[in-house]
Amino acid sequence: MQTRKQKMIPRGLRNNNPLNIRIGNTWLGEREHPTDGEFEEFVSLAYGLRAALIILRRYIRRYHLNTVRLIVERWAPRNENETEKYIQFVCKDTGLMPNTTIQYEDEKTMCKLVGAMAFVECGQRIEKDEIIKGYSLA
């Protein structure tokens, strides 16, 4: 049972899953006894960020979803989200244009992208050092 204080922490941060990845794959760093039932739970924020970065890289490499617009439209579909506002925020926060091509091996851009997306998903900033840890694990 969660305490009131724990419930006040955004779900993505409670689960160390700042991009709110739904349960599906088996990930390195998953919690041994998850309780969420809908979203992945990781042992640390770095592992949750690692999983998010792996998915985003896959979007770019395999599916050629290589712009903020294409990535966010896949990640946060219009039937569940305010996708256009999500895109606008990520672009403003990262300095990227919606249709600028993103290179998956560009650490700085990928870290900015995942940081901005995490803010949209959880409403809180993730420390840059944590994002870099996740990137180094990915």
Task: Kindly give the residue locations of the regions a language model identified.
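Cell-wall polysaccharide-cleaving catalytic domain and substrate-binding groove, primarily
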Residues: 1-138
